[in-house]
Regions:
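Long, low-complexity, compositionally biased intrinsically disordered regions
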Residues: 271-393
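Residues lining hydrophobic/aromatic ligand-binding pockets adjacent to catalytic sites
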Residues: 1-283
């Protein structure tokens, strides 16, 4: 088949503090504004963790180029918490999210809504059909399975019936099989790391192995969306631009961004960790600071060290629960439910980027190191499973 389709490639999310040293020239410039000059599309990852505010969606529309394309993840309250019990509650939540995304849909900037299912969700054709029948009309959808039982002909038949795109993945759980089930295609590169997936830098050979698959898909549909989700350290930017270069699709602006990303990543690997002065105190302390830097960003972590010890009051800190007060703010963490509830002003922004704020960092630096290491390792290894929340008012 002739290769006539569009291939729009970007990253999963764009507002990562650690990308400033690799991709973004400064920390003050609008990240979406700069990002949209380099990439034609982005996957909105923050909507998976919380419903966006109406003004935020309007802002995405207003401050992005006319032909820019967003794809948004459906909130996990729908796909993970309400999925088993289909009915009016989940239908209302779907309608609520769809209505919030209308500004992007009406302006032609919304490609599709992504349904990311939990690993526990196993093959059930009747349940899947019932769920797909509840999806609001007027939108396109892609669906990502996390269990191998879905890899069968019946699944492709159902998805084709509803024109829902099967999400082709590169990840540890499922094989990178190519299945086209809609008039567009969706590819996600998650990384192949173990602790977690996303902390992974694809090699040139690993990317080259994907070229035949990308070309096959691109020639079968009108539009192919591709997103690199290995966002740690800015790897997603470099890998995404690298595969575009291999496909001979790199623009001059992207070529310059790729050179800058490669140079900055190389220099980052060569220089010592910038927070070395805070790692004194043994191997556990060094590991704790290193892990915190990964899930906070060095700027927020550095600010954690500036908070006086007397500003922190620890009510409880063990392997099950953390209950603390930092200045006028509260923090409650629960290991069993994987929940973090906090109320500082920066926390609302941190929720969007899936990072811890300086106050949480300070608490984790204050409690016993072995306890803190257990918590930070659990968050680092399974970031997607954790719920970042504000107190209910």
């Amino acid at each position: 088949m002739a290769n006539t389709g569009r291939f729009l490639l970007g990253t999963s999310g764009w507002s990562y503090a650690e990308w400033v040293a690799v991709f973004y020239p400064t920390s003050t410039e609008s990240k979406l504004g700069f990002y949209s000059k380099i990439f034609p599309t982005v996957e909105i990852d923050s909507t998976f963790y919380a419903f966006p505010k109406e003004g935020m969606v309007i802002g995405w529309d207003r401050y992005s180029p006319r032909n820019f394309v967003f794809n948004a993840k459906i909130p996990q309250t729908i796909t993970h918490e309400r999925l088993e019990a289909l009915g009016k509650p989940i239908e209302e939540e779907l309608d609520r999210f769809a209505n919030l995304m209308l500004p992007l849909n009406n302006s032609g900037k919304l490609g599709c809504l992504l349904i990311q299912l939990p690993p526990r969700y196993k093959f059930d054709s009747n349940h899947l059909e019932e769920f797909l029948s509840l999806l609001p009309h007027g939108f396109k959808y892609a669906i990502e399975f996390r269990h191998k039982s879905w890899l069968r002909d019946e699944t492709w038949r159902i998805l084709s019936k509803y024109n829902v795109a099967y999400t082709i993945v590169d990840e540890p759980l499922l094989p990178p099989e190519v299945h086209v089930t809609a008039d567009f295609a969706y590819i996600r590169w998650h990384g192949r790391g173990q602790r977690p997936w996303y902390d992974y830098h694809y090699t040139e050979k690993e990317l080259a192995d994907w070229l035949p698959k990308v070309k096959e898909v691109e020639g079968s549909v009108k539009t192919t969306y591709g997103y690199f989700n290995n966002h740690f350290h800015g790897y997603a930017v470099e890998n995404g631009l690298s595969i575009l270069k291999m496909l001979d699709k790199l623009t001059p602006a992207q070529e310059e961004a790729l050179k800058r990303a490669r140079t900055n990543l190389r220099q980052a690997k060569e220089k010592p960790v910038g927070l070395g002065e805070f790692t004194r105190g043994g191997e556990d302390r060094a590991k704790l600071v290193d892990l915190l830097g990964t899930i906070m960003g060095e700027t927020r972590l550095a600010r954690s060290f500036t908070i006086p010890d007397e500003d922190v009051k620890i009510k409880e800190a063990n392997l099950k629960t953390i209950d603390a007060k930092i200045r006028d703010y509260t923090l409650k963490m629960d290991m069993a439910s994987k929940t973090i509830v906090h109320d500082c002003g920066d926390w609302e922004r941190a929720i969007e980027t899936r990072q811890l704020c300086k106050h949480i960092g300070k608490v984790l630096l204050t409690i016993p190191e072995q306890v803190a290491l257990t918590w930070v390792s659990a968050i680092h290894e399974n970031l997607d499973a954790w719920k970042f929340q504000q107190p209910r008012k």
